[in-house]
A protein has these predicted regions:
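Histidine-centered beta-alpha loop that forms part of the nucleotide-sugar donor binding/catalytic region
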Residues: 1, 128-129, 149-152, 199-200
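Short amphipathic alpha-helix
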Residues: 8-19, 33-40
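Short, conserved loop/helix-junction motifs that constitute active-site signature segments
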Residues: 21, 118, 138-142, 164-169, ...
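N-terminal strand-loop element at the rim of the active site
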Residues: 24-98
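Short N-terminal targeting/anchoring amphipathic segment
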Residues: 102, 112-129
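A short beta-strand/loop micro-motif in the catalytic core of glycosyltransferases
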Residues: 125, 169-178
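A short, histidine- and acid-enriched strand-loop-helix "catalytic/donor-clamping" loop
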Residues: 131-134, 142-159, 172
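Carbohydrate-associated surface elements
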Residues: 179, 201
């Protein structure tokens, strides 16, 4: 969703490095157009974002940039209005459970206000749960679609209602550990045969 300096984002960069540039044409779209790791994206990867900030999402200045961007995105394509019933319904559900997660509510809006990409792809991969998964599911035209999960699905606050039951539509679902897989399959038992464990790749030299 961003390219900040966290573990999942670093693992994504390592994965991009592993694809032979002679065999694959790779494009990358970062949903929230921000993160310092953009400077480390392999040169053969085409970055689709028309605008981008390399400010760290953890820095004071970077947080200002990100918050301003999120506020602006609420109104693009009428995303917040289109999702208003969804936001109300899921906010009420969260209140009943005693835990409100604003970020989970906003992912759908951020997905629907993302950049319009008209190209058709052989394969599209959402590397993070939440906004990236929703964006690939709803707005990317591709023959095959895969997605990744890096967090305990239930503990993180995700629900089928928040997802709009999008996961069964993915051909493959990759989780970064057996524990993450177990949590996800508990929520989506029908996806068990299409869910695989794919451990994060690590740059041994960097360590």
């Amino acid at each position: 969703n961003t390219l900040g300096g966290a573990g999942a984002e670093k693992a994504l960069l390592e994965l991009l490095k592993r694809f032979p540039k002679e065999q694959y044409e790779i494009s990358l779209y970062v949903l929230l157009d921000q993160g310092e790791l953009i400077l480390q994206v392999p040169s053969h990867v085409k970055v689709l974002n028309r605008e981008y900030s390399d400010a760290s999402v953890l820095s004071r200045e970077g947080k200002k940039v990100l918050n301003k961007k999120i506020w602006k995105r609420l109104w693009i394509h009428g995303a917040v209005f289109r999702n208003f019933p969804f936001l109300i319904r899921n906010t009420v559900a969260m209140i009943k459970k005693g835990k409100i997660s604003p970020d989970k509510l906003l992912w759908r809006v951020m997905s629907d206000s993302g950049q319009v990409i008209r190209e058709h792809y052989d394969m599209a991969i959402a590397y993070l749960e939440g906004g990236a998964t929703y964006y690939v599911h709803d707005h990317v035209n591709a023959d095959r679609k895969f997605t990744f999960l890096h967090v305990d699905y239930g503990f993180a606050g995700y629900t089928r209602e928040l997802d709009k039951n999008c996961y069964p539509d993915f051909e493959r679902i990759f989780t970064v550990s057996d524990e993450v897989k177990k949590s996800f399959v508990k929520a989506y038992p029908e996806c068990s045969k299409d869910t695989y464990v794919f451990h994060n790749l690590i740059d041994q030299k960097e360590i």
